[in-house]
Amino acid sequence: MSNWKTLNANYVYKTAFGNLRKDTCELPDGQIIEEYYVNEYADWVNAIVLTKEKQIVLVKQYRYAAQDFFLEIPAGKPEEDEAYEHAILREVKEETGFISEKQPILLGEFYVNPATQTNKVVSFLIVDAHKAFDQELDPTEFIDVQLVDLNDMETMIATGEINQLFTVSAYYMSKSLLTK
């Protein structure tokens, strides 16, 4: 199997949020795709945050593209040259006010949609978290913090109360570590 070749790449637009690129590609058999669109987004981090009382820290926020509210795990984008581990600790503290003296446990790094997007999500587990600060939200963030008993997560996923893919996948990746 051979790689595709990029014959030409032009930005349709660039923004602080992400870029849209239009490429011309050559397939291994010589076919040409004149307009292949690639979304360039930054990597982001998320975490299952477990308190000492065996509750999972979730955030509820409105997601404009889906036109609905979602119950999710804390997440965010690393700042310039910020290590993923530092980024998730900062994001959890800013969004929820929770911290932990223990280091985040890496669950994995996964491409979000490698067909059309360049970014990865890096998922962590943070244990023994406790509330130590008030939220420090960005001007465009409106987030409610909710604590959910660990034993209720699977029911909430099964019933669709939690239906954001990256929250669900991080939970199931962390499950074997949560029961220890």
PLM ranges: what are they?
Residues W4, F69, E80, L106, ...:
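Nudix hydrolase/Nudix homology domain
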